[in-house]
Amino acid sequence: MMSGAATREELSLTVDTAQWGWLRPHLERGGIIVVSPDLDLVEAGFGISSDDTAMVSEWIDTGRVAKPSATQIFDWDAEPDTPFRILIASPYVLVQPLSPLVS
């Protein structure tokens, strides 16, 4: 088993989907990080897990990674079936809302 940060390939194999209702407990412990749709989820996970502070700081400064806003939390609590792509980069759970289907 490798020590240190996971590789991009290893992280890509752990991307999954989950509904907000499953993710809510992670929010309560402060573990949810929202990744904007224009940032690759695996790249964000790699930057965080490898402690690339310069890159992660840039993402934070540009709003590409952030803690969920009160509005997002309110909306997701109202729709607990809201689907997300997720990636665990311990101690965080990185989430990207999946685009709703237009009907």
List the model feature ranges, each with a label.
Residues 43-76:
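Short, hydrophobic/π-rich interface segment
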Residues 1-50:
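N-terminal, charge-rich interaction modules
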Residues 7, 14-17, 53, 62, ...:
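Residue-identity detector for threonine
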Residues 37-39, 60-64, 91-93:
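Generic secondary-structure microfeatures
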Residues 3, 12, 36, 49-50, ...:
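Generic serine detector
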Residues 23-25, 62, 79:
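Enriched - but not universal
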Residues 67-103:
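Short, compact, well-ordered microdomains
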